[in-house]
Amino acid sequence: MERISARPPLLSFGIDMLGPVLLEFGTESQKREHLPRIARGEIRWCQGYSEPGAGSDLAGLQTRATEKGDHYLLNGAKIWTSFAHLSDWIFCLVRTDFDVPKHEGISFLLFDMASKGIQVKPIQLISGSSQFCETFFENVQVPKTNLVGVKNEGWKIAKRLLQHERNMVAGMGSRGNSRKARYSMENQAKFYVGEKDHKVADHALRDKITRYKMKSQAFRLTLKRVSSETKVSSNPSPTSSIFKYFGTELNKVRCEIMM
């Protein structure tokens, strides 16, 4: 994308989170079914992780998936499901065994949000927006072929996906970093506070922009390097958590300068 000067794809749970997980853990059938549509932007995914009683302690989730012939029968609820009301499919953590330690009885399922028995309620935020939702499942039938990886071993997949999610969030801190971008920091500074020759006379502002750009570029290259290392390692890396923190702070700096 960068080599042909194409704009980055829109924020996508499919591209940034689920796609890499399917490449690593999915069956060939699952890859053929979902990856082309993800790449073409034809399908929107949401994430079924957090529950009313399982947020920070994600492994305490209680949404139940019971085997019934060739499918699972799903019952439970998720919360803070981003854009569930606009999504086509969901990747969801469910409990398939209640008689083992909580980290060992979790499975990773994919299913259509148009399935019978799903109810979505947007959560009204103080800002007036409603990108987060409550999602309820009542006897939702999910084909067993939609199980990613091995039954009861979904916690490993869940952690891997969270690693990709943290890298995605971290990368937001360096977005809009291209000089060619119409709304890049440099172009906005030239337009709003630039002189007739479009040069920015404010030395302090120029210094802030330069320092941000240096950190952003270094961070972007570091993310690339670690992403390459992730492909050859089966263990989740703690660096993704560090990157999420640094990327969030970097994004705050960007917003403060733009204001």
Where are the model-predicted features located?
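Internal helix-loop-helix
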Residues: 1-32, 36-41, 83-89, 216, ...
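Short Gly/Pro-enriched turn/cap motifs at secondary-structure boundaries
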Residues: 53-56, 80-83, 98-100, 124-131
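Alpha-helical transition-metal enzyme core signature, strongest for iron centers
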Residues: 11, 38, 178, 182, ...
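A short, Trp-centered hydrophobic/proline-enriched beta-strand micro-motif
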Residues: 41-49, 93
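A short core secondary-structure module
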Residues: 71, 75-121
